[in-house]
Design a protein with these regions (language model features):
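A polyanion-binding, active-site-adjacent surface
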Residues: 2-219
């Protein structure tokens, strides 16, 4: 007997506004009056995991310290490792081209990664590496205190939403976890090799833009 097809949650609620799925976790998070510069100073020449021995540069993060939208990726690639800044390679160029779909510019957002040092040969981050690095990402989030966190790819999605599910099952929907509205979507680099994912990523960026339009900053 064929399994009944599971209905995907509607993106609109009964009042016609964008629906957001509630996810437990982060409920007790509060913003911290600590600057990104202070967090970076604590990191210093971090050697908390073996990646500190193989990196060229620690890639902390870059962007607007008061951003409404924070993008979180997986980890630095070769270009990021060389330049010390996230999303400067092909994935960064792809991301820049997509931001306009959400009504955003690069200077509007903040970008960081789950880990801050490039894994050798761009392999996936190891659990101990994520464990060592994650407290600093949490402090960045609490310092910026964005309205929306955009998770690019599986590792960011699983870290923020505390799930083992992959982004392909979770994208296309907004999630609320504590203060934060979270949007999982594909990593821009993945669309370079999976061109059929690009329209889905574009749709997600439009969804982000709609949410921002529906939730303007209160003066």
């Amino acid at each position: 007997m064929a399994r009944a097809k599971r209905e995907r949650p509607s993106l609109m609620d009964a009042e016609g506004t964008m629906a957001v799925m509630q996810i437990p976790g982060h409920d007790h998070q509060k913003p911290r009056e600590v600057t990104l510069e202070e967090i970076r100073a604590v990191l210093g020449d971090c050697q908390l995991c073996p990646l500190g021995q193989t990196r060229t540069n620690l890639v902390f993060g870059v962007g607007n310290p008061h951003a409404r939208v924070m993008f979180i990726g997986e980890g630095p690639g070769r270009n990021e490792d060389l330049q010390g800044e996230p999303f400067v390679g092909a994935a960064g160029q792809k991301l820049n081209s997509l931001l306009g779909l959400a009504g955003l510019r690069r200077e509007d957002i903040y970008i960081a990664n789950v880990i801050k040092c490039r894994p050798p040969s761009n392999r996936n981050p190891q659990p101990d590496e994520i464990t060592a690095c994650s407290p600093f990402l949490r402090e960045q989030i609490r310092s910026i205190w964005p309205d929306v966190i955009v998770c690019l790819g599986n590792f960011a999605t699983q870290f923020v939403l505390r799930t083992e599910m992959g982004v392909t099952k979770l994208r296309g929907q907004l999630y609320q976890t504590g203060h934060f509205t979270v949007m999982p979507t594909f990593h821009p680099a993945a669309t370079i090799y999976h061109s059929d994912w690009l329209p889905l990523l574009e749709n997600d960026m439009r969804m982000l833009g709609q949410w921002l339009a529906d939730h303007p900053v209160q003066e």
